[in-house]
């Protein structure tokens, strides 16, 4: 009855020593007692394979490979001792919730905290730690008077209340999984299990007090217990504790066992020290042996040769990093005879690498096993249950409904879900619209039109969806006993036929050979039912709001995981560094060696801080390590990772993450470079494999095909490529799988993305109206000037975005224009002059108009939610303020409002605007002028055109020159040319102006009077545009003008002339602009009707048309593609623009004159 220690650094053969001793016992038939090999839970499968390989099947007649948990299960099966079921983590959290609620009156420190999401899990972790470290209620009570820290005292006191109540309730129906080893300890003492057996304990770094108790019992009754320790001679002989020593955690574990041996009179057999021999793992590999010896040694010896078994790679990003690993693995397997099972890839942040490894390894045909448990939270069954609750919780929100439908378990066809989604988004269906008695009869559903077949189908789909959900909601809504809520969940799953669909999926997965999916979906059903059953057992009689129960259930789902066993033996193992021990690894790739990742940076302290743990340790309550200690323990994990491979090691780190943010290399990289000064750091630019082997890019079909594309691009651009690529091309061209893809390469190389021409006849059919006339609005022609292709898609092909129930900027524009028009009509009906309107009167009229509109249109979006009702009130303020400013502007001048919302350009009413194209084609322009003001002055009539804008719009001559801002000038030209028809007299231009609808915020460092505020508002909302260069007309727009105007963009000098900052033009310049714009419209129309739909968006300064275009995904404009270039709007000076405009008009007139003379 003794304990023997087996010492050895990493690679010295400690595990081999254990298996050899077991083999020796079996071969020599020394006795017939059991031989036990005790290893951590995650290593049992691999260790059994090792024994099978080293000893053979006959080993298992006497040998058992166990973990502590597996030992407990075996003992309970053979000797009894556990009659109750082990509670799941979810049930445990439910029980904690119940215990906290029942004792909430005694909890002051945790009272508010207990309502926060995740608190139950935090308490669960503390209780689990108490149990693993044998902290009983009595031991907590014993330290009550010893704690001087008031906060810690209260914290421990309340933890004791929860802990004690938890244990009492737990033992009524279940056993806590953390109590298993305590029960095992008792059962071992009561039984004769393992008497005279020999035990080898391998691969452990440390033991919990529970595990130490088991070791103590085994040591007392077994012939001998052998325990391996990964430690060097220096640390072994050092009796003082050094937290910075990489082997400190091992030394600490050894000391704990020595203490147990001393206290229990357990014999100490002479230890085996394997450090004195050449490391078994590194025989013949001096480089890896050098890492093991010197990476954590100070001082260290440099390795003065060129390393061949170590590679250091600096990756551009994670994708580049894993692709380099994939190339290396493929090369080693193909050229060096390695098996995939000899290779492992590890990192410290597996979640960041999981998906990218899956994609790239699939491309390279590399079989792999991801050593990570599957989280069930994203499983469709969990999603279905969660979203069923969320639909009730979030009142049938779009997100919750379609999360439910897209789980795939509802039985609704995907095509119907897509059609329903469009309908839901267009009509903003949520809340009462889902739950109304008969959807088909609802006003919002029928609208003003007929009940179409499509709507009938939508109503049927909605009914099929809502019936089981509403039945479920009726059962759980409000406060109910948990057992009734659980019954409702089960009945709902049966109603929706979930279990039948899952069974169908499992059959499909089996046919496709997706073993991991088969395992996941086979277990998820029983896991969910177990969670529901445990909820009934643990808190079944408790009455809870459905929302509170859903919170508890969600935390239960979040904690559920499924462990996966490898489905094949020859696979690359991928996992976390912490789980790499216990494997025979010949080749290891450590990826993601970045600062703060490896070694991992400091972790969260948890409910009990480092200071709390230190204080508790001083009074006899010893718990797990502090975060400071855990940081040093990371060094040991790093040591194990660096020394686990026997033949080859590759270290790599990315320089940037997926978002392009830079990442720093870990101190590991700099340390390796110092130990191996001749080690060359490779990268995508400097890849030794490619430099040494020109065929290094020919690997697996998919990555080689990707390289072929790059090479063909180089060849197309007249760059040098290796001659063998022509043979590679021939191979792919003759391969059935890649033949079509090869053809697409040539299409891609010659792809210019410029947009084909469309025939004139087709364009006429697309653009002409019912009377076969070509009618365009001025704003549409501006859009063509911005980008011909975008115009063609929107107005030629009639492409539209999916309708969404929201208030968009165009909706706001229409709403504002309608309200301003209604306001003008109201003022006219009441016979009130604009100049007589007060701010209060403006507010009153606008408020009444908006209220009436919302009352008349009950289904308006502005009536739908509190958010939109708030917006309606805000629009009242904005429009009222704007109307007040407009009234003030009109009151300051002599111009009178002539027309508002004036439609012109209809080919059937005087043909107000007609463009005669060069091929005798006629184009009719339509438009709507927001407001026309007129002034009779000295026998002349002047007109002022005003356009209301809800967004920022400035007058820009550059944009006029390029045809991007011609609306106001076209309107002006139409009015002047047709003034007799419209105004019964000839008119002259007075101004063309933009007015911004806004309620500006006035900022000031000093207190302001009402008059000063009003002046600042007028200044902020001053109209922008062009004004006739005539002092009489300007003063007729602002009779109060003194120096500068608060109404228009004009200001006077002291001598009465206009300042240079004034936006004023002469009547002749107005004529020139009108003529230029008229010709520009003709030019645009001719270009458009010629079939030119080139992809050429404009770019003004740093703003490109594409930034606001809804059709970018269609044209796929990319400046990297040949012929994809912006039409750059060059910002020229005002003088240059005028010179260019006049020059173009003169040239055009000369050309017309020559043509007329020739005729």
Curated annotation (Swiss-Prot):
Pfam families: ADDB_N, PDDEXK_1. ATP binds at residues 8-15. InterPro entries: ADDB_N (IPR049035), DNA_helicase_suAddB (IPR014140), DNA_helicase_UvrD-like_C (IPR014017), P-loop_NTPase (IPR027417), PDDEXK-like_dom_sf (IPR011604), PDDEXK_AddAB-type (IPR038726), Restrct_endonuc-II-like (IPR011335). It comes from the Bacteria. [4Fe-4S] cluster binds at residues 787, 1106, 1109, 1115. Disulfide bonds: none annotated. SUPFAM superfamilies: P-loop containing nucleoside triphosphate hydrolases (SSF52540), Restriction endonuclease-like (SSF52980). Residues 1-401 form the UvrD-like helicase ATP-binding domain. Despite having conserved helicase domains, this subunit does not have helicase activity. The heterodimer acts as both an ATP-dependent DNA helicase and an ATP-dependent, dual-direction single-stranded exonuclease. Recognizes the chi site generating a DNA molecule suitable for the initiation of homologous recombination. The AddB subunit has 5' -> 3' nuclease activity but not helicase activity. HAMAP family: AddB_type1. Belongs to the helicase family. AddB/RexB type 1 subfamily. This is ATP-dependent helicase/deoxyribonuclease subunit B. It comes from Clostridium beijerinckii (strain ATCC 51743 / NCIMB 8052). The lineage of its organism: Bacteria, Bacillati, Bacillota, Clostridia, Eubacteriales. The gene is addB.
């Amino acid at each position: 009855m003794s304990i023997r220690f087996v010492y050895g650094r990493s690679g010295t053969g400690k595990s081999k020593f254990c298996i050899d001793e077991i083999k020796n016992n079996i071969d020599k038939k020394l006795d017939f007692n059991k031989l036990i090999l005790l290893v951590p839970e995650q290593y049992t499968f691999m260790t059994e394979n090792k024994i099978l390989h080293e000893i053979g099947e006959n080993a298992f007649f006497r040998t058992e490979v166990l973990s502590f948990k597996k030992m407990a299960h075996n003992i309970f099966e053979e000797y009894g001792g556990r009659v109750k079921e082990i509670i799941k983590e979810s049930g445990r959290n439910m029980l904690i919730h119940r215990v906290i609620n029942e004792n909430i009156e005694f909890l002051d420190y945790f009272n508010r905290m207990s309502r926060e999401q995740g608190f139950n899990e935090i308490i669960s972790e503390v209780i689990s730690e108490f149990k693993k470290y044998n902290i009983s209620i009595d031991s907590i009570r014993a330290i009550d008077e010893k704690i001087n820290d008031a906060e810690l005292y209260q914290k421990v006191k309340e933890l004791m209340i929860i802990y004690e109540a938890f244990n009492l309730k737990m033992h009524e129906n279940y056993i806590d999984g953390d109590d298993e080893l305590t029960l095992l300890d008792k059962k071992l003492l009561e039984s004769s299990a393992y008497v005279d057996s020999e035990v080898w304990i391998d691969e452990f770094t440390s033991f919990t007090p529970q595990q130490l108790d088991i070791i103590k019992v085994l040591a007392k009754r077994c012939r001998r217990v052998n325990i391996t320790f990964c430690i060097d001679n220096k640390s072994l002989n050092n009796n003082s504790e050094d937290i910075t020593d990489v082997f400190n955690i091992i030394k600490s574990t050894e000391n704990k066992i020595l203490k147990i041996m001393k206290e229990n009179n357990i014999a100490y057999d002479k230890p085996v020290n394997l450090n004195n021999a050449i490391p078994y793992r590194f025989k013949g590999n001096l480089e890896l042996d050098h890492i093991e010896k010197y990476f954590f040694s100070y001082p260290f010896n440099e390795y003065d040769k060129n390393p061949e078994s170590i590679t250091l790679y600096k990756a551009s990003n994670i994708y580049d990093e894993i692709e380099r690993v994939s190339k290396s693995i493929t090369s080693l397997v193909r050229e060096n005879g390695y098996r995939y099972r000899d290779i492992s890839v590890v990192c410290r942040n597996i979640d960041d690498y999981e998906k990218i490894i899956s994609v790239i390894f699939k491309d390279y045909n590399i079989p792999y096993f991801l050593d990570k448990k599957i989280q069930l939270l994203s499983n469709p069954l969990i999603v279905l249950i969660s979203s069923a609750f969320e639909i009730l919780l979030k009142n049938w929100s779009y997100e919750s409904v379609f999360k439910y439908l897209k789980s795939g378990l509802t039985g609704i066809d995907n095509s119907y879900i897509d059609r329903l989604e469009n309908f839901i988004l267009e009509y903003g269906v949520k809340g009462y619209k889902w739950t109304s008695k008969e959807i088909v009869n609802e006003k919002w559903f029928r609208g003003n039109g007929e009940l179409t077949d499509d709507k009938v189908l939508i109503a049927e789909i909605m009914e099929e969806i809502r019936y089981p959900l509403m039945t479920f909601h009726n059962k759980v809504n409000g406060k109910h006993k948990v057992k009734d809520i659980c019954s409702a969940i089960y009945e709902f799953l049966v109603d929706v036929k979930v279990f039948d669909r899952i069974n169908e999926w499992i059959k499909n997965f089996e046919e496709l050979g997706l073993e991991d999916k088969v395992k996941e979906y086979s277990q998820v059903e029983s896991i969910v039912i177990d969670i529901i059953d445990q909820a009934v057992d643990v808190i079944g009689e408790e009455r809870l709001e459905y929302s509170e129960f859903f919170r508890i259930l969600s935390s239960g789902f979040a904690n559920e995981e499924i462990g996966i066993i490898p489905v094949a033996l020859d696979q690359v193992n991928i996992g976390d560094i912490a789980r790499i021990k216990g494997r025979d690894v010949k080749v290891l790739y450590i990826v993601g060696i970045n600062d703060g990742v490896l070694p991992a940076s400091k972790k969260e302290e948890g409910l009990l801080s480092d200071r709390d743990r230190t204080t508790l340790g001083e009074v006899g309550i010893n718990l797990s390590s502090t975060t400071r200690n855990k940081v040093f323990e990371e060094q040991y994990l790093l040591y194990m990772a660096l020394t686990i491979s026997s033949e080859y090691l590759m270290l790599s780190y990315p320089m940037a993450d997926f978002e392009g943010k830079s990442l720093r290399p870990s101190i590991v990289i700099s340390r390796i470079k110092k130990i191996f000064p001749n080690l060359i750091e490779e990268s995508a630019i400097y890849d030794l494999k490619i430099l040494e082997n020109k065929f290094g890019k020919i690997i697996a079909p998919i990555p080689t095909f990707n390289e072929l594309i790059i090479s063909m691009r180089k060849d197309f651009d007249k760059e040098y490529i290796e001659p063998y690529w022509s043979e590679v091309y021939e191979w792919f061209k003759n391969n059935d799988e890649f033949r079509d893809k090869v053809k697409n390469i040539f299409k891609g190389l010659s792809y210019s993305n410029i947009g084909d021409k469309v025939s004139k006849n087709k364009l006429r059919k697309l653009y002409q109206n019912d009377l076969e006339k070509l009618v365009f609005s001025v704003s549409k022609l501006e859009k063509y000037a911005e980008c011909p292709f975008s115009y063609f898609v929107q107005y030629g092909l009639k492409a539209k975005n999916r309708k969404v129930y929201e208030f968009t900027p165009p909706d706001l524009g229409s709403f504002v224009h309608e309200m301003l028009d209604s306001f003008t009509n109201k003022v006219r009906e009441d016979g009130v002059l604009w100049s007589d309107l007060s701010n209060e009167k403006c507010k009153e009229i606008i408020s009444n108009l908006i209220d009436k509109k919302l009352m008349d249109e009950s289904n308006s979006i502005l009536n739908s939610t509190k958010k939109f009702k708030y917006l309606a009130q805000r629009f009242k303020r904005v429009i009222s303020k704007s109307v007040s400013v407009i009234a003030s502007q009109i009151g300051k001048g002599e111009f009178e409002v002539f027309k508002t919302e004036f439609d012109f350009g209809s080919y059937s009413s005087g043909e107000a605007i007609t463009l005669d194209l060069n091929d005798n084609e006629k184009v009719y322009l339509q438009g709507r002028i927001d407001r026309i003001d007129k002034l009779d002055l000295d026998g002349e009539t002047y007109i002022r055109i005003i356009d209301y804008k809800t967004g920022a719009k400035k007058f820009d001559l550059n944009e006029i020159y390029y045809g991007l801002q011609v609306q106001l000038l076209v309107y002006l030209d139409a009015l002047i040319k047709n003034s007799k028809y419209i105004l019964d007299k000839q008119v002259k231009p007075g101004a063309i102006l933009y007015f911004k609808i806004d309620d500006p915020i006035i900022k000031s460092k000093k207190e302001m009077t009402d008059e000063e505020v009003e002046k600042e508002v007028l200044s902020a909302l001053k109209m922008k545009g062009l004004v006739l260069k005539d002092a009489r007309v300007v003063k007729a727009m602002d009779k109060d003008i003194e120096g500068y105007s608060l109404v228009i963009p004009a200001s006077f000098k002291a001598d009465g002339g206009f300042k240079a900052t004034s936006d004023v033009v002469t009547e002749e310049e107005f004529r020139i602009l009108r003529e230029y714009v008229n010709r520009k419209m003709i030019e645009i129309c001719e270009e458009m009707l010629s079939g030119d739909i080139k992809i050429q968006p404009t770019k003004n300064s740093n703003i490109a048309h594409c930034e606001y275009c809804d059709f970018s995904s269609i044209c796929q404009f990319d400046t990297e593609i040949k012929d994809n270039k912006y039409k750059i709007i060059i910002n020229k000076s005002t003088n240059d623009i005028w010179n260019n405009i006049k020059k173009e008009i003169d040239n055009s007139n000369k050309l017309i004159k020559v043509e007329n003379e020739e005729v």
